[in-house]
Amino acid sequence: MDEERYPALPWQGWKIVKRLGRGGYGSVYLAQRNSAGVMEDAAVKVISFPKNEEDIEADFTDGYDLVSVRNKYKNMLHRYVDEYQIMLAFKGQTNIVSCDDFEAKPHKDGIGWDVFIRMELLTPLTTLIKQYAGIIPEEMVIKVGKDICSALMLCDSKNIVHRDIKPENIMVSEFGDYKLGDFGIARTMDHTTQATTVGSERYMAPEVIKREEYGKEVDIYSLGLVLYWMLNNRKRPFIDADHLPTHDEIELAQARREKGDPLPVSYTHLRAHETLRHL
């Protein structure tokens, strides 16, 4: 098996050690540098778009000319610039992932970009909870709720709606502080009341799915679903916590939630209801 080749980083002294995760357009890596004998760690998100030549060919097949294709990917770059600017505004805050640097390099053919975002190294919530074979401790769920509520208060102070709160976007520091990350689709309130569908439908508020007008309350709803999921044996609402659901059961549960049915108390054995009520 060939050894994986990592991209070169644009910051002096920083080198990629290993891949931590992979997403639709890129990957997150562990990066290190030796600073006066002290080893520093960071997480680096590397996003490349287009992903490959097939994406470009598809654009031309769809009728784009060269200028339009270049503009398409330039607009995609603006999304990541916006994400960096939002995270930079929150740099140093306890409950929001701290972003340290950003670089964007155009592709040699002039079509597309490589984006590098360097952030503090943290543990994903989804990784942390794997150590719990059974029930996740209520104290942990309450701590997640309080910390991410603090993050949302900061977002509110900047008139920002995150729009994609889910377990994968919550991190924890070595000191036990939970942090909200990935502001890639966050928007200011001025641009959020429009009926746009973004984020993960698994944790999306019904009004967003229905393309109705919405505001900051959709983030609170999504956080509530994350906490419910943690307390309900990692099952979302309307799914029995005590057995492995079928595909049809998952689809039916999603449809009931989108319809706005009250969340069931019985499946959570009253535990989730009482904990969420006291947050």
Language model regions located:
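Short beta-strand micro-motifs within the conserved protein kinase catalytic domain, predominantly
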Residues: S98-W113
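Conserved short submotifs of the Hanks-type protein kinase catalytic core
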Residues: G110-L125
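Activation segment signature within eukaryotic-like protein kinase domains
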Residues: V144-G145
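Catalytic-loop of the protein kinase fold
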Residues: D156-V172
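Conserved catalytic-loop aspartate of Hanks-type protein kinases
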Residues: D219
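Conserved small/polar residues in nucleotide/adenosyl-binding loops
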Residues: T268-T275
